[in-house]
């Protein structure tokens, strides 16, 4: 059953092109680093810029592998060796030099270009292990990761590099991080949009979430008088929900009175099926 309040999914070819543009931007930013900057702190606590680059390469290779094996009707783990393999790969990759990182990113771009199906191909619907989804889900995950971590690199790529389509996708994907008594109202958008645990939806009326329109009939909807409403611009709210520092912190209100921003839940698991 299609939810009439859910905005359209991002266009696959648009996502593929923008993910490639983001990877190229990361590679260009990496070329400008010296050894000290590479070893310096990123925007992610405990990770150097080299760790971020290692992760970008690792997640890109993981999603390329999902697509490559799906083309042969095979399902494989997201990371070879699971979570332990992921961590070991990041730590090993963090020892690369600037030139080695650039080479790895360039090779990754070529691999991804070859791995993704052609425009309109039915291969986009092939199943993958990632979130029990399809090759489209693997592509969107890569797009999400490379755009977010491009900013985490803290090397000149800011939130202004996030296209509007990414911001909308992040709100839909990360809405599950919100508690049931929290909803988000976006300001400055041509269409009234709201975000709640059910994801991104077209707003029904001020103060009421349209989650009653979702297929889950037990969802009672959200009344702003009973919970917290977070208001902010698209990119700022998306950054906050992604656990990143927004350019302008969103505002939170309970019963019309300003209140601290609510806590958010964990990042959706790569093993959780898509909604």
Regions from the language model: what does each represent?
Residues 23-27, 31, 60-64, 106-117, ...:
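Structural signal for well-ordered, non-membrane alpha-helices
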Residues 15-22, 55, 101-104, 108, ...:
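Amphipathic alpha-helix face/heptad-repeat signature
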Residues 2-18, 22-36:
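Hydrophobic, proline/glycine-rich low-complexity stretches
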Residues 50-53, 102, 238:
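Generic structural signal for individual residues within well-ordered alpha-helical segments
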Residues 2-14, 68-78, 118-275:
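Structured surface interface patches that mediate subunit assembly and partner/cofactor docking
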Residues 27-48, 115-131:
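Helix-loop segments that flank and shape redox-cofactor active sites
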Residues 14-18, 28, 36-65:
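Active-site-proximal cofactor/substrate-binding loop regions of enzyme domains
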Residues 1-14, 62-111:
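Short, helix-capping/interhelical loops that line the mouth of catalytic, cofactor-
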């Amino acid at each position: 059953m299609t939810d009439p309040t859910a905005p359209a999914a991002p266009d696959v070819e648009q996502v593929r092109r923008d993910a490639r543009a983001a990877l190229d931007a990361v590679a260009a930013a990496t070329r400008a680093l010296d050894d000290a900057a590479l070893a310096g702190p990123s925007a992610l606590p405990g990770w150097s810029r080299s760790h971020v680059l290692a992760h970008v390469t690792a997640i890109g290779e993981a999603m390329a592998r999902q697509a490559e094996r799906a083309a042969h009707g095979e399902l494989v783990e997201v990371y070879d060796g699971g979570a332990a393999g992921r961590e070991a790969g990041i730590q090993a990759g963090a020892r690369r030099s600037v030139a080695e990182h650039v080479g790895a990113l360039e090779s990754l771009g070529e691999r991804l270009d070859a791995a993704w199906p052609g425009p309109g191909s039915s291969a986009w619907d092939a199943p993958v292990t990632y979130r029990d989804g399809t090759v489209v889900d693997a592509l969107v995950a890569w797009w999400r990761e490379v755009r977010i971590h491009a900013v985490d690199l803290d090397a000149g790529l800011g939130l202004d590099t996030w296209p509007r389509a990414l911001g909308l996708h992040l709100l839909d994907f990360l809405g599950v991080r919100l508690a049931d008594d929290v909803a988000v109202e976006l300001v400055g958008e041509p269409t009234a949009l709201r975000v709640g645990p059910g994801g991104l939806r077209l707003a029904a009326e001020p103060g009421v979430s349209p989650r009653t329109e979702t297929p889950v009939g037990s969802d009672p909807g959200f009344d702003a008088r009973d919970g917290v409403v977070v208001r902010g611009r698209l990119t700022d709210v998306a950054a906050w929900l992604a656990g990143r520092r927004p350019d302008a912190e969103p505002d939170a209100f309970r019963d019309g009175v300003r209140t601290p921003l609510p806590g958010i839940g964990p990042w959706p698991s790569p093993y959780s099926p898509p909604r």
